[in-house]
Every structure is written in structure tokens, then in C-alpha cells.
Amino acid sequence: MQDTAKYLIHADITAAGVVERSDVVGAVFGQTEGLLGDELDLRDLQDSKKVGRIDVEIRSEGGQSFGEITVASGLDRVETAILAAALETIEQVGPCRAEIEVSEIEDVRSAKRREVVERATELLNDFEEKSIQTADIVETVRQQVRVADVTDYEGLPAGPRVADSDAIVVVEGRSDVMQLLKYGIKNAVAVEGTDVPDAIADLTAGRTVTSFLDGDRGGDLILKELAQVGDVDYVAVTPSDKSVEDLSRSEVMSALRDKVPYETVASAKSLDSIREEMSQAGESTTADGGAVAAATSDDAADNQPSPSSQTGSAKVETTDGTTSVVDNSNATAVADATTDEETTENGDGPTIPSLSDHIEAVIQTHSGTARLVDEDATLLAEGDADAVVSLLESTEDVPKTVVIDADCSQKLLDVAAQRGVDVVVAAGHGEYVKQPTAVQVRIES
């Protein structure tokens, strides 16, 4: 009955003499019989399993007896209270005067509810510790894919296209290879230290080799030794105070696009010096951009490319298996990736808007719309701000930035993290509990 009881009646008993348990039980049944009528007769209630057994704990001390009576009840609250009050009418136990006082009517279900709450709290805490957030799932999958793509070339970390590609990118460590894989470059190989392995030296023979090293002391040493034991065709340098593994996609592509022939910087003392020379050359090229473009156009019309000019192009293997050619000679055409940009500079093509232009058009004009743009600020999709989540889910290309004339919501952040969006530019902070670590929120008003 204890397992199905709703209430427990606790009563204290005091007897002026020595009594035993059987005396107490007999007094309870005997002196309550007929007191409450047939419906609440204690024996009938026990027979129908509405009242459990009567538990008595009794002890004698100094010629008196003390103890506790416990009765399990399956009746409702009113009937249980009546039954408890009936116990207090008992005045004699065996041959001794006695007094019974109900100390408590315990609600067994309340105790069970407390246990349920405590246990549920423990289970929930364990569950939350083991659960994976949406952003964590996305990042975990990305990392596992990157690690899976890292292959082994003569014991060195490398992209899957290193062995069969006619162009390779030499980097310092495994993390650099993984970073380039993240951006779709699959022909990178790591030297794993300042001592260039023989496998790398042999690999550079007969291939177009681009060194892409950190601009620190270690990078300087690797470049010098690589040039001594192998062949280096081009040098790409990272932005100041940055490592390859810390670069964004646009920074990686820009560095590889702007690489220079090794012969032109062979006398440089360090990668920092090369960076300075490239910066000065870039300023000079910008000043004379129109003339260079015109000369390039004439040369392309009058002359076929020679073998030497063809070797002036470096190749980068991308995720789709195609080979994009990036030409770094100041006298030849630039890479396809920059054709539209240079056409714009020469005034022959449409102007590509910047991210600031999108923000102004969407948020500052209170347009009530949303735009999805890529890393070059090219518009991928546009729609109503209220439908930005479905717009983001249905867009085939992964946008880098979402610009929305509305508050940033939790749903938008979750979907943005799933799609791999880097930045959400919104008109205001919305109600969101958790911001994914991979998504930056920027407020423009």
C-alpha cells in the first residue's frame, strides 16, 4: 500500500505504562470501529486496499511507552483528515491511559514530485553537457572534412592533388594545409619545420612552385633553404603580422594572386622586405594602371604567348578539380578573378558595389528588405526582410554576409551558422539567447 498511497498519517503516541505493538493496533481498530460509519470503517478500508497496514514503533522507558503510528491512506484529502482525527479519539491502549496526537499528514505525491524535479534537473544538466549546438555541429563537420582531405605525401601533410598537380604551394605546417583546404586549395604541401625535407626538394623539380610562408624568422629560413635545395618560381607573402592559418579566404586568394617571381626578390633579406617591395611596386602599378592596361592589350593582340610567359603563371587546384591560372607578371594580363575589377577601374564595365553600398541601400534607406552578398560584395539574392531565413536556406551559393533591414533573430543566426555565413549586418539587436561563435553580428542604424 505504501507504493500506491496518496497520504501518510504520522501520529505520536504516549502511554502511561508499558504497552506493546499489538496493544496499540488493537486499540486503533477497536476504538474507531463504528465511529465514522460504514464507509470509513478501518477494517473495511483495509480490505478494499484504500488504507494500508498500521505501522507502530513503540519503546518503553521509565514506566512509560512512547512511539509513532504511521497509516498509509489512498483516500482523498478530506477522508484522510477525518481518519487522522479519529485516531486522536483513542484514550486507552491495553490497561494504560494513552494519548495520540497527529503530527503530520504527508502528501506522498509532493515528495515524489520533488524527487521528479531533482532527478529531471540532473538529467537535463547531463543532457545539456553532452548535447551539441547547431554551430558546433557545422564546425565539427567542416573540421572533419578538412582533416579527411589532408593526405600524406612522403610523410608530410599535403592536399589530395599534390602528387599529380603540375603546380604546388609550399607552406610551413599542417594547420596551413588545412586552412588552404578550407578555401578549396588542394595542392598545398607542408615542410613541417625549418629543415626542408628531400621529398619537398624533389617535388619542386619540373613543377611551378609557390612558397606561401609566414612573415617571421622561420619563414625566412625555410624560403632560403628551399631556394637552395629546390626550385622556387613564385613567392606569396601574408599580410603584416599574420600567419597563413589565420588568413581569411579573401586574404589567401589576394596573397596568391599578388605573388611575385622569385628572381625579382631573391636578393631580399626577409619576407618583410619582399612585402615592402611588393607594396611599393603596387603603388607604382596603380599610378600607371591605364598605360599598363593599354600596353597589355596591344601585346596580347600582336603576339602569341611564349613558353617563358606561360611559365609565368601559377596554378592553384580548387575543390571542383579545375585549375585557375593566376598571372603575376606586371606586363601580362591579370588573373580571371580580377578581370572585372580592373575593367571597372578602366571605366569599361559596371561598378561593383561595396558592402557599405549594400548597407546604405538596405538599412539606411529603411527598405524592409534583405540582401545576401558574397566576399566580393556581389549580390547573390535579395528579398523581403521577413523572409530572410527561407531566402538564406534556398540560395545555392553560400553568402559571406547577410544585410537585413530588421532586428537580428535567433532563427537567422542559427541558419546563418548552418550555411557558413560569416557576418550578419542588421538594423538592431533582436531577441536571441545564444550567438554562434562562427557568426559575427554587426548593427547599423
Curated annotation (Swiss-Prot):
CDD domains: TOPRIM_primases (cd01029). Residues 276-355 are annotated as: Disordered. Residues 303-313 have a biased composition (Polar residues). It catalyses: ssDNA + n NTP = ssDNA/pppN(pN)n-1 hybrid + (n-1) diphosphate. Residues 284-298, 324-337 have a biased composition (Low complexity). Mg(2+) 1 binds at residues 172, 214. Pfam families: Toprim_4. Mg(2+) 2 binds at residues 214, 216. One of its GO terms (biological process) is DNA replication, synthesis of primer. Its EC number is 2.7.7.101. Its cofactor is Mg(2+). The keyword Transcription applies. The keyword Transcription applies. Binds two Mg(2+) per subunit. Keywords: DNA replication, DNA-directed RNA polymerase, Magnesium, Metal-binding, Nucleotidyltransferase, Primosome, Transcription, Transferase. GO terms for molecular function: DNA-directed RNA polymerase activity; metal ion binding; poly(A) binding. One of its GO terms (cellular component) is DNA-directed RNA polymerase complex. Signal peptide: none annotated. Residues 166-252 form the Toprim domain. Belongs to the archaeal DnaG primase family. RNA polymerase that catalyzes the synthesis of short RNA molecules used as primers for DNA polymerase during DNA replication. Forms a ternary complex with MCM helicase and DNA. This is DNA primase DnaG. It comes from Haloarcula marismortui (strain ATCC 43049 / DSM 3752 / JCM 8966 / VKM B-1809) (Halobacterium marismortui).
